[in-house]
Protein backbone atom coordinates (compact mmCIF):
# COMPACT_ATOMS: atom_id res chain seq x y z
CA UNK A 1 0.00 0.00 0.00
CA UNK A 2 1.39 3.37 -1.02
CA UNK A 3 2.31 5.60 1.91
CA UNK A 4 0.57 8.97 2.11
CA UNK A 5 2.78 12.07 1.81
CA UNK A 6 3.43 13.75 5.15
CA UNK A 7 2.44 17.42 5.15
CA UNK A 8 3.33 19.61 8.14
CA UNK A 9 1.59 22.91 8.78
CA UNK A 10 3.49 25.32 11.02
CA UNK A 11 0.89 27.58 12.59
CA UNK A 12 -2.63 26.44 13.47
CA UNK A 13 -4.53 29.71 13.11
CA UNK A 14 -7.14 30.48 10.47
CA UNK A 15 -4.90 29.74 7.48
CA UNK A 16 -3.36 26.65 9.08
CA UNK A 17 -6.78 25.22 9.95
CA UNK A 18 -8.13 25.96 6.46
CA UNK A 19 -5.06 24.35 4.87
CA UNK A 20 -5.60 21.21 6.96
CA UNK A 21 -9.26 21.07 5.94
CA UNK A 22 -8.45 21.45 2.22
CA UNK A 23 -5.65 18.86 2.38
CA UNK A 24 -8.04 16.45 4.09
CA UNK A 25 -10.86 17.05 1.57
CA UNK A 26 -8.47 16.59 -1.36
CA UNK A 27 -6.82 13.59 0.35
CA UNK A 28 -3.36 14.99 -0.45
CA UNK A 29 -1.61 13.39 2.52
CA UNK A 30 -1.40 12.92 6.28
CA UNK A 31 -1.20 16.12 8.27
CA UNK A 32 0.83 17.38 11.22
CA UNK A 33 -0.68 20.57 12.62
CA UNK A 34 1.92 22.41 14.73
CA UNK A 35 1.53 25.44 16.97
CA UNK A 36 3.30 26.86 20.02
CA UNK A 37 -0.09 27.45 21.67
CA UNK A 38 -0.96 24.39 23.78
CA UNK A 39 -4.27 22.75 22.96
CA UNK A 40 -4.92 24.75 19.77
CA UNK A 41 -3.47 22.29 17.21
CA UNK A 42 -4.74 19.29 19.15
CA UNK A 43 -8.29 20.68 19.29
CA UNK A 44 -8.31 21.62 15.60
CA UNK A 45 -6.86 18.24 14.61
CA UNK A 46 -9.62 16.41 16.50
CA UNK A 47 -12.33 18.62 14.97
CA UNK A 48 -10.86 18.14 11.48
CA UNK A 49 -10.62 14.36 11.85
CA UNK A 50 -14.26 14.23 12.90
CA UNK A 51 -15.13 16.30 9.80
CA UNK A 52 -13.02 13.98 7.63
CA UNK A 53 -14.95 10.98 8.99
CA UNK A 54 -18.16 12.42 7.50
CA UNK A 55 -16.36 12.65 4.14
CA UNK A 56 -15.16 9.06 4.52
CA UNK A 57 -11.53 10.18 4.61
CA UNK A 58 -8.96 8.15 6.54
CA UNK A 59 -6.34 10.91 6.38
CA UNK A 60 -4.41 11.11 9.66
CA UNK A 61 -4.26 14.52 11.34
CA UNK A 62 -2.04 15.07 14.38
CA UNK A 63 -1.98 18.25 16.47
CA UNK A 64 1.28 18.96 18.29
CA UNK A 65 3.46 21.48 20.11
CA UNK A 66 6.61 19.43 19.45
CA UNK A 67 8.71 20.08 16.34
CA UNK A 68 9.95 16.49 16.43
CA UNK A 69 6.59 15.44 15.00
CA UNK A 70 7.39 17.13 11.65
CA UNK A 71 10.33 14.75 11.13
CA UNK A 72 10.47 13.32 7.62
CA UNK A 73 7.87 15.69 6.17
CA UNK A 74 7.47 15.69 2.40
CA UNK A 75 6.13 19.25 2.46
CA UNK A 76 5.89 22.04 5.02
CA UNK A 77 3.63 25.08 4.80
CA UNK A 78 4.39 27.96 7.16
CA UNK A 79 1.75 30.39 8.39
CA UNK A 80 3.22 31.03 11.85
CA UNK A 81 3.64 34.67 12.78
CA UNK A 82 1.81 37.79 13.85
CA UNK A 83 -1.17 38.48 11.56
CA UNK A 84 -1.98 41.86 10.05
CA UNK A 85 -4.26 44.15 12.00
CA UNK A 86 -6.25 47.16 10.71
CA UNK A 87 -3.96 50.03 9.73
CA UNK A 88 -0.92 47.74 9.76
CA UNK A 89 1.09 47.18 6.59
CA UNK A 90 2.78 43.85 5.85
CA UNK A 91 6.07 45.58 6.47
CA UNK A 92 5.18 46.55 10.06
CA UNK A 93 5.34 42.85 10.86
CA UNK A 94 8.94 42.44 9.81
CA UNK A 95 10.86 42.37 13.07
CA UNK A 96 8.65 40.05 15.12
CA UNK A 97 8.01 37.63 12.27
CA UNK A 98 11.70 37.45 11.32
CA UNK A 99 12.44 36.02 14.80
CA UNK A 100 9.63 33.49 14.44
CA UNK A 101 10.77 32.48 10.94
CA UNK A 102 14.36 31.93 12.09
CA UNK A 103 13.13 29.54 14.78
CA UNK A 104 10.90 27.66 12.32
CA UNK A 105 13.79 27.44 9.82
CA UNK A 106 16.15 25.93 12.39
CA UNK A 107 13.61 23.21 13.19
CA UNK A 108 12.96 22.43 9.53
CA UNK A 109 16.74 22.16 9.07
CA UNK A 110 16.83 19.73 12.00
CA UNK A 111 13.80 17.56 11.25
CA UNK A 112 12.61 18.06 7.65
CA UNK A 113 15.59 18.93 5.46
CA UNK A 114 14.14 17.09 2.43
CA UNK A 115 10.80 18.89 2.50
CA UNK A 116 9.32 21.25 -0.08
CA UNK A 117 8.62 24.45 1.85
CA UNK A 118 5.90 27.01 1.12
CA UNK A 119 5.97 30.23 3.15
CA UNK A 120 2.77 32.26 3.63
CA UNK A 121 3.82 34.43 6.59
CA UNK A 122 4.04 38.18 5.85
CA UNK A 123 5.93 40.22 4.84
CA UNK A 124 6.17 37.35 2.40
CA UNK A 125 9.18 38.20 0.22
CA UNK A 126 11.33 38.79 3.32
CA UNK A 127 10.11 35.78 5.31
CA UNK A 128 10.79 33.32 2.49
CA UNK A 129 14.31 34.81 2.11
CA UNK A 130 14.91 34.31 5.85
CA UNK A 131 13.65 30.72 5.56
CA UNK A 132 16.11 29.94 2.75
CA UNK A 133 19.12 31.47 4.48
CA UNK A 134 18.41 30.03 7.93
CA UNK A 135 17.32 26.53 6.86
CA UNK A 136 20.09 25.85 4.35
CA UNK A 137 17.59 24.07 2.10
CA UNK A 138 18.14 24.20 -1.69
CA UNK A 139 16.49 27.27 -3.24
CA UNK A 140 14.33 25.15 -5.57
CA UNK A 141 12.64 23.67 -2.48
CA UNK A 142 11.70 26.98 -0.80
CA UNK A 143 9.05 29.27 -2.28
CA UNK A 144 6.57 31.89 -1.14
CA UNK A 145 2.83 32.11 -1.74
CA UNK A 146 2.22 35.46 -3.45
CA UNK A 147 1.29 35.75 -7.10
CA UNK A 148 -1.23 32.89 -7.07
CA UNK A 149 -3.29 34.84 -4.53
CA UNK A 150 -2.74 38.24 -6.18
CA UNK A 151 -3.68 36.79 -9.58
CA UNK A 152 -6.80 35.16 -8.13
CA UNK A 153 -7.95 38.55 -6.85
CA UNK A 154 -7.15 40.20 -10.18
CA UNK A 155 -8.97 37.38 -12.04
CA UNK A 156 -12.08 37.78 -9.89
CA UNK A 157 -12.29 41.54 -10.40
CA UNK A 158 -11.67 41.17 -14.16
CA UNK A 159 -14.35 38.47 -14.43
CA UNK A 160 -16.82 40.81 -12.74
CA UNK A 161 -15.85 43.72 -15.00
CA UNK A 162 -16.25 41.70 -18.21
CA UNK A 163 -19.19 39.66 -16.85
CA UNK A 164 -17.60 36.31 -17.67
CA UNK A 165 -16.72 33.13 -15.78
CA UNK A 166 -13.49 33.24 -13.77
CA UNK A 167 -12.51 30.13 -15.79
CA UNK A 168 -12.12 32.40 -18.84
CA UNK A 169 -9.69 34.76 -17.08
CA UNK A 170 -5.91 34.33 -16.85
CA UNK A 171 -3.61 36.94 -15.38
CA UNK A 172 -0.06 37.43 -14.17
CA UNK A 173 0.89 39.62 -11.21
CA UNK A 174 4.66 40.12 -10.80
CA UNK A 175 6.76 41.63 -8.05
CA UNK A 176 6.58 41.86 -4.28
CA UNK A 177 3.52 40.68 -2.37
CA UNK A 178 2.49 44.17 -1.34
CA UNK A 179 1.56 47.62 -2.60
CA UNK A 180 4.23 47.57 -5.35
CA UNK A 181 3.00 44.38 -7.05
CA UNK A 182 2.68 44.65 -10.84
CA UNK A 183 -0.47 43.25 -12.51
CA UNK A 184 0.57 42.76 -16.16
CA UNK A 185 -2.26 43.74 -18.50
CA UNK A 186 -0.49 42.52 -21.67
CA UNK A 187 -0.22 39.03 -20.22
CA UNK A 188 -3.74 39.06 -18.74
CA UNK A 189 -6.45 37.63 -20.97
CA UNK A 190 -10.13 36.78 -21.28
CA UNK A 191 -10.32 33.52 -23.29
CA UNK A 192 -6.91 34.31 -24.79
CA UNK A 193 -7.71 37.93 -25.74
CA UNK A 194 -5.38 40.41 -23.96
CA UNK A 195 -7.07 43.04 -21.76
CA UNK A 196 -5.64 46.00 -23.79
CA UNK A 197 -7.35 44.58 -26.92
CA UNK A 198 -10.66 44.25 -25.06
CA UNK A 199 -10.37 47.89 -23.99
CA UNK A 200 -9.85 48.87 -27.64
CA UNK A 201 -13.02 46.93 -28.51
CA UNK A 202 -14.91 49.12 -26.04
CA UNK A 203 -15.68 46.29 -23.60
CA UNK A 204 -14.07 48.19 -20.72
CA UNK A 205 -12.07 51.37 -20.17
CA UNK A 206 -8.57 52.25 -18.99
CA UNK A 207 -10.17 54.03 -16.02
CA UNK A 208 -12.09 50.92 -14.91
CA UNK A 209 -9.06 48.67 -15.33
CA UNK A 210 -6.88 51.08 -13.32
CA UNK A 211 -9.44 50.87 -10.50
CA UNK A 212 -9.25 47.07 -10.67
CA UNK A 213 -5.44 47.18 -10.53
CA UNK A 214 -5.59 49.41 -7.43
CA UNK A 215 -8.15 47.14 -5.81
CA UNK A 216 -5.94 44.12 -6.52
CA UNK A 217 -2.93 45.83 -4.94
CA UNK A 218 -5.00 46.58 -1.83
CA UNK A 219 -6.81 43.23 -1.89
CA UNK A 220 -5.46 42.02 1.44
CA UNK A 221 -5.97 45.39 3.12
CA UNK A 222 -9.59 45.55 1.95
CA UNK A 223 -10.34 42.25 3.71
CA UNK A 224 -8.45 43.29 6.88
CA UNK A 225 -10.51 46.49 7.00
CA UNK A 226 -13.80 44.58 6.63
CA UNK A 227 -12.97 41.81 9.11
CA UNK A 228 -11.55 44.27 11.69
CA UNK A 229 -10.06 41.46 13.79
CA UNK A 230 -8.09 39.42 11.26
CA UNK A 231 -6.93 38.96 7.69
CA UNK A 232 -7.77 36.79 4.66
CA UNK A 233 -7.38 33.05 5.07
CA UNK A 234 -9.58 31.10 2.65
CA UNK A 235 -7.93 32.44 -0.53
CA UNK A 236 -4.33 32.34 0.84
CA UNK A 237 -4.89 28.71 1.89
CA UNK A 238 -6.41 27.77 -1.49
CA UNK A 239 -3.43 29.43 -3.24
CA UNK A 240 -0.90 27.42 -1.23
CA UNK A 241 -2.83 24.21 -1.93
CA UNK A 242 -2.52 24.83 -5.70
CA UNK A 243 1.26 25.10 -5.24
CA UNK A 244 1.42 22.03 -2.98
CA UNK A 245 -0.65 19.92 -5.38
CA UNK A 246 1.56 20.84 -8.34
CA UNK A 247 4.57 19.60 -6.32
CA UNK A 248 3.07 16.42 -4.87
CA UNK A 249 1.42 15.33 -8.14
CA UNK A 250 4.22 16.59 -10.43
CA UNK A 251 1.64 18.64 -12.35
CA UNK A 252 4.29 21.06 -13.67
CA UNK A 253 1.88 23.97 -13.48
CA UNK A 254 3.04 27.50 -14.23
CA UNK A 255 2.21 29.52 -11.11
CA UNK A 256 3.38 32.96 -10.04
CA UNK A 257 5.20 32.60 -6.71
CA UNK A 258 7.95 34.28 -4.73
CA UNK A 259 10.97 32.45 -6.17
CA UNK A 260 14.70 32.80 -5.55
CA UNK A 261 16.40 34.50 -8.49
CA UNK A 262 20.03 33.96 -9.49
CA UNK A 263 20.35 36.16 -12.55
CA UNK A 264 16.88 35.77 -14.03
CA UNK A 265 15.41 39.20 -14.78
CA UNK A 266 18.95 40.48 -13.98
CA UNK A 267 18.20 39.95 -10.27
CA UNK A 268 20.52 38.10 -7.90
CA UNK A 269 20.01 36.69 -4.38
CA UNK A 270 16.41 37.84 -3.96
CA UNK A 271 12.90 36.42 -3.69
CA UNK A 272 10.32 38.12 -5.87
CA UNK A 273 7.04 37.13 -7.51
CA UNK A 274 7.62 35.60 -10.97
CA UNK A 275 6.03 32.76 -12.97
CA UNK A 276 7.63 29.38 -12.24
CA UNK A 277 7.02 25.74 -13.15
CA UNK A 278 6.40 23.58 -10.06
CA UNK A 279 6.86 19.81 -10.21
CA UNK A 280 8.27 16.95 -8.13
CA UNK A 281 11.74 18.59 -8.05
CA UNK A 282 10.24 21.79 -6.63
CA UNK A 283 10.94 24.83 -8.77
CA UNK A 284 11.76 23.36 -12.18
CA UNK A 285 12.13 26.60 -14.10
CA UNK A 286 11.72 30.36 -13.71
CA UNK A 287 9.79 31.80 -16.67
CA UNK A 288 11.41 35.04 -17.88
CA UNK A 289 8.78 37.27 -19.47
CA UNK A 290 9.74 39.90 -22.03
CA UNK A 291 8.78 43.14 -20.31
CA UNK A 292 8.24 46.56 -21.87
CA UNK A 293 10.25 49.51 -20.53
CA UNK A 294 7.22 50.69 -18.55
CA UNK A 295 6.68 47.24 -17.05
CA UNK A 296 10.38 46.98 -16.18
CA UNK A 297 10.25 50.30 -14.31
CA UNK A 298 7.30 49.10 -12.20
CA UNK A 299 8.83 45.65 -11.64
CA UNK A 300 12.25 46.96 -10.58
CA UNK A 301 10.57 49.51 -8.30
CA UNK A 302 8.95 46.55 -6.55
CA UNK A 303 12.32 44.75 -6.43
CA UNK A 304 13.94 47.83 -4.86
CA UNK A 305 11.28 47.93 -2.12
CA UNK A 306 11.90 44.26 -1.27
CA UNK A 307 15.68 44.86 -1.17
CA UNK A 308 15.20 47.77 1.24
CA UNK A 309 13.24 45.56 3.62
CA UNK A 310 15.84 42.79 3.45
CA UNK A 311 18.51 45.36 4.33
CA UNK A 312 16.63 46.11 7.58
CA UNK A 313 17.08 42.54 8.82
CA UNK A 314 20.75 42.08 7.87
UniProtKB/Swiss-Prot annotation:
**Under which main EC class is this enzyme filed?**
oxidoreductase
Alphabetical UniProt keywords? NAD, Oxidoreductase, Tricarboxylic acid cycle
Q: Which residues bind NAD(+)?
A: 11-16, 35, 97, 120-122
Residues that bind substrate: 84, 90, 122, 153
List the catalytic activities from the record.
(S)-malate + NAD(+) = oxaloacetate + NADH + H(+)
Q: Which GO terms describe its molecular function?
A: L-lactate dehydrogenase activity; L-malate dehydrogenase (NAD+) activity
A GO BP term, please? lactate metabolic process
The active-site annotation reads 177
Which Pfam families does this one have? Ldh_1_C (PF02866), Ldh_1_N (PF00056)
Instruction: Check the record and name the CDD domains matching this protein.
Output: LDH-like_MDH
Which InterPro entries does its entry note? L-lactate/malate_DH, Lactate/malate_DH_C, Lactate/malate_DH_N, Lactate_DH/Glyco_Ohase_4_C, Malate_DH_type3, NAD(P)-bd_dom_sf
Gene3D superfamilies, A to Z: Lactate dehydrogenase/glycoside hydrolase, family 4, C-terminal (3.90.110.10), NAD(P)-binding Rossmann-like Domain (3.40.50.720)
Q: What is its EC number?
A: 1.1.1.37
Query: What's this chain's function?
Result: Catalyzes the reversible oxidation of malate to oxaloacetate.
UniProt record similarity statement: Belongs to the LDH/MDH superfamily. MDH type 3 family.
Quote the protein name from its UniProt record: Malate dehydrogenase
The top of its lineage is:
Bacteria, Pseudomonadati, Pseudomonadota, Alphaproteobacteria, Rickettsiales
**Gene name for this UniProt entry:** mdh
Amino acid sequence: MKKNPKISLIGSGNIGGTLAHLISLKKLGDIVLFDVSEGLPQGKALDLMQAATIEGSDIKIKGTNDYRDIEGSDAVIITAGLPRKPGMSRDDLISVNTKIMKDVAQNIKKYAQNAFVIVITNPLDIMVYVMLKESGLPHNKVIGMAGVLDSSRFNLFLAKEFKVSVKNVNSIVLGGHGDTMVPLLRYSTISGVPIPDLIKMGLSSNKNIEKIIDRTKNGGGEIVKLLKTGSAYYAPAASAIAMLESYLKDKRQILTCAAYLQGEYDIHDLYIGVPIIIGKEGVIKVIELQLTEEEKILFYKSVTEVKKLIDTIQ
